[in-house]
UniProtKB/Swiss-Prot annotation:
Species whose genome carries this gene: Murine polyomavirus (strain P16 small-plaque)
Keyword annotations of the record: Capsid protein, Caveolin-mediated endocytosis of virus by host, Disulfide bond, Host nucleus, Host-virus interaction, Late protein, Phosphoprotein, T=7 icosahedral capsid protein, Viral attachment to host cell, Viral penetration into host cytoplasm, Virion, Virus endocytosis by host, Virus entry into host cell
This protein's record includes keyword Phosphoprotein: yes
In-chain residues carrying the UniProt-annotated modification Phosphothreonine: 358
Compartments where located: Virion; Host nucleus
GO molecular function list: structural molecule activity
Protein name (record): Capsid protein VP1
Length: 384
């Protein structure tokens, strides 16, 4: 007779005498861009792709278009003018490369703004690249020749310092002002400088990090790159990427492909939330400079950048209660006046009294009471 098989239960196995404790569930809260993030919206129409491009703003504006009246410099800066001394440095506005930016208006998602939850667009990923790098192969132009003695060889191609930055966000890019020399006299007409924002002349702190020298990139071609930089202390609702390569004869190095995707989600899996259905794109792409043959004048060269952004819908908690919206509506209906100061350092308010309920008549009409930071009522005893 064949031997019987023993039971499959191992003698070494120990059974749990009681159920293992489970961690208590707690609410999970994510805050992004000032919004309380809820769940994703599902459905076939929840994902949108947008393609756009930004042209460079190197100093020369898009107009005039005539190639004999300034249009030939579009995509370039005008000739860089040097300082005549340490205290006399006043660059022309058309020699300063500036930030390119644009706002894309997305389809409206919410018809009823009184609900507790709203839908918002969320930027998930972006494909981007600099367009036109092949144009830098032009070595037959009227630039400084490589053989300066016999005026032969080839035309010196674009080379020098390069700066590449792009940003995608649900709000304008936050900028921090910082300059090389606070004595530089930037012209305020046509560009936004630190003095434009602070209403004061630049100080030595503007050569490092001055907390008051901050701005938002709200205008295209107005914020010089050498003054304004992405603010790492802010930009919670924006993703920016960049690199800088310095040098006077550094050759441009560019990689381009339509297969590289940059994910815009943070460590919590949340991308920039587009407030007011607005998507903001920003970039700077400086390739270096060209040197003209006649006067050895240097001109910055910039190239355009292409964007392909993928967006999806998200449910968020309505951050604006109906009561505050109605209150804001009534407040905006009131006329704006400019009177004497009743707030701040120069306030002309003498005294404020607050009454609540009733009490027996106090024996001291000048009695002083106040509420401390713990919410307790205190009475000041009269001094001698």
């Amino acid at each position: 007779m064949a031997p019987k098989r023993k039971s499959g239960v191992s003698k070494c196995e120990t059974k749990c005498t009681k159920a293992c404790p489970r961690p208590a569930p707690v609410p999970k809260l994510l805050i992004k861009g000032g919004m309380e993030v809820l769940d994703l919206v599902t459905g076939p129409d929840s994902v949108t792709e947008i393609e756009a491009f930004l042209n460079p703003r190197m100093g020369q504006p898009p107009t005039p278009e005539s190639l004999t009246e300034g249009g030939q410099y579009y995509g370039w800066s005008r000739g860089i003018n040097l300082a005549t001394s340490d205290t006399e440095d006043s660059p022309g506005n058309n020699t300063l490369p500036t930030w390119s930016m644009a706002k894309l208006q997305l389809p409206m998602l919410n018809e009823d703004l009184t609900c507790d939850t709203l839908q918002m667009w969320e930027a998930v990923s972006v494909k981007t690249e600099v367009v036109g790098s092949g144009s830098l192969l032009d070595v037959h132009g009227f630039n400084k020749p490589t053989d300066t003695v016999n005026t032969k060889g080839i035309s010196t191609p674009v080379e020098g310092s390069q700066y590449h930055v792009f940003a995608v966000g649900g709000e304008p890019l936050d900028l921090q002002g910082l300059v090389t020399d606070a004595r530089t006299k930037y012209k305020e007409e046509g560009v936004v400088t630190i003095k434009t924002i602070t209403k004061k002349d630049m100080v030595n702190k503007d050569q490092v990090l001055n907390p008051i020298s901050k701005a938002k990139l709200d205008k295209d071609g107005m914020y010089p790159v050498e003054i304004w930089h992405p603010d790492p202390a802010k930009n919670e609702n924006t993703r920016y990427f960049g690199n800088y390569t310095g040098g006077t004869t550094t050759p441009p190095v560019l990689q381009f492909t339509n297969t590289l995707t940059t994910v815009l989600l943070d460590e919590n899996g949340v991308g920039p939330l587009c407030k007011g259905e607005g998507l903001y794109l920003s970039c700077v792409d400086i390739m270096g400079w060209r040197v003209t043959r006649n006067y050895d004048v240097h001109h910055w060269r910039g190239l355009p950048r292409y964007f392909k952004i993928t967006l999806r819908k998200r449910w968020v908690k309505n951050p604006y209660p109906m009561a505050s919206l109605i209150s804001s509506l009534f407040n905006n209906m009131l006329p704006q006046v400019q009177g004497q100061p009743m707030e701040g350092e120069n306030t002309q308010v003498e005294e404020v009294r607050v009454y609540d309920g009733t009490e027996p008549v106090p024996g001291d009409p000048d009695m002083t009471r106040y509420v401390d930071r713990f919410g307790k009522t205190k009475t000041v005893f009269p001094g001698n």
